[in-house]
Amino acid sequence: MNLGGKRLAGKSQGKSRRKTPWDVEEDLTPTQEFLQTHYRERYMARHPKLIETGEAELINSFVPTHCPYCGSERFSKRGFTANGIQRYFCSCSQRFLPTTKTIFDSRKIPISEWTEYCLNLFRYVSINADSWNNKNAFSTSRYWLEKLFKTLEDYQQSTILSGMVWLDETYYPVIISQLDRKEDGSKFRGLSHNQICIGAATDKENIVCFVEGVGKPSQRKTFDAFYNHIAPGSTLVHDKETTHKKLVSSLRLKSQEYLAKDLKGLKDSENPMNPINRIHDSLKKFLNAHSGFNRDSLQNYMNLFTFVRNPPHEPLEKVAKIVNLAFENPKSLRYREQFGLNHDF
């Protein structure tokens, strides 16, 4: 399902934030020298040397259980890197580190800075704004986002809602450049294939969100999306959509149905669908912070959004969970894999 995307614009997107306009100049004015010095100091504060961050102790605390290349448990310690990270040597003749084949493999930027990046995302800061705040190239911020997507791609698999469960669909437009129009140039009305359907559900403790295709969803798509994420016998609070029938009958759900027209004009406190409506509002705000993203990556954004909204609710605890997940369920993504072929975003 190609939903359209946005291409990284030009080489300026990958320009190093470390550079100033006067790096090759010999005679600077007092103003230029002041600005250059101040800018460089702030850059270095944001980008400390790895050996100065103390992260070697963190990385070394994750002791590998097997070789990331061959899977063998026959390996031994073999000294340290210049940054103090434990090196291992396997019987297959491969050397590796605790970070090998994880999202932190071959990194040049400290995990501490990646932590700040995650905290910004949790606050709905766009990656473009984060790029400027942390003085990173835009491509670096984009690369980190793809690594985060990689880490969270299976995140929702184990989430099961129970008890009172609110479920409803919302819609998000395809990217403007990919809008399908009528022959006269006008837009299609209603829930056309220019609208991407997102199914969301919550039990007020956790949420799940899944892309269900374009236009109005079907019973099959809704069933496939939520069947493994709602406990049998739960109570489903939803609107009177026929697309929910198969899900309700298969899981033997108690159904509380409401007509959308009967809920119009109600205060939030009186609206029985308010718990899921609030999720939809937050989801739109989150997506709008990244409005030019490739819609083919929409499910990745759903995984990230649910991670942001679900427990633990303390942001630093979320970062700790991601770091642990990165080492315990390692997945890697090389920079060249992401940008070498000039992928669409």
Can you describe what each PLM-predicted range is?
Residues 1-345:
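Residue-level recognition of single "structural anchor" positions
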